[in-house]
Amino acid sequence: MRVGCDIIAISRIEKIHSRHGKNFLDKFLSPKEQILIKNPATLAGLWAAKEAASKALGVGICELCSFFDIEISKDERNAPKLKYSQKITKDFNITQTSLSISHDNGFAIAIVAIV
């Protein structure tokens, strides 16, 4: 099992988004993921989730793993789900993923576990 964690100030993501708008979103979220955004806390949670997912691989966001190799969605109970691209799943021999996202006191945090 490998674990990745990321925490970010919601105000930081909110500031970047207000400055760059959709261009910022397009750099790290697919159109399907952008639909999930309800408020700045949700957006910060998505950022933290992708960062945590890349850290669980032990590489971070880089040429080995881009933001678009990581897909965040919701299940039928509205819980976050994580899916890696086929290439990442194969290269890192991933069989299971687990994602938790939380927001509190101006911060968003995400934890990812992969097997």
From Swiss-Prot:
EC number(s) from the headed UniProt entry: 2.7.8.7
Annotated GO biological process: fatty acid biosynthetic process
Annotated binding of Mg(2+), by residue: 6, 51
Cofactor(s), by name: Mg(2+)
Reaction(s) catalysed (UniProt annotation): apo-[ACP] + CoA = holo-[ACP] + adenosine 3',5'-bisphosphate + H(+)
Primary localization: cytoplasm
InterPro entries in alphabetical order: 4-PPantetheinyl_Trfase_dom, 4-PPantetheinyl_Trfase_dom_sf, ACPS, Ppantetheine-prot_Trfase_dom
Pfam families: ACPS
Protein transport is among the record's keywords: no
Organism: Campylobacter jejuni subsp. doylei (strain ATCC BAA-1458 / RM4099 / 269.97)
Described purpose of this protein according to its UniProt entry: Transfers the 4'-phosphopantetheine moiety from coenzyme A to a Ser of acyl-carrier-protein.
Subcellular location as annotated: Cytoplasm
Protein name: Holo-[acyl-carrier-protein] synthase
This protein's GO CC annotations: cytoplasm
Gene Ontology MF terms: holo-[acyl-carrier-protein] synthase activity; magnesium ion binding
Superkingdom of source: Bacteria
Keywords, in A-Z order: Cytoplasm, Fatty acid biosynthesis, Fatty acid metabolism, Lipid biosynthesis, Lipid metabolism, Magnesium, Metal-binding, Transferase
Gene behind this protein: acpS
Family classification: Belongs to the P-Pant transferase superfamily. AcpS family.
Transmembrane segments: none
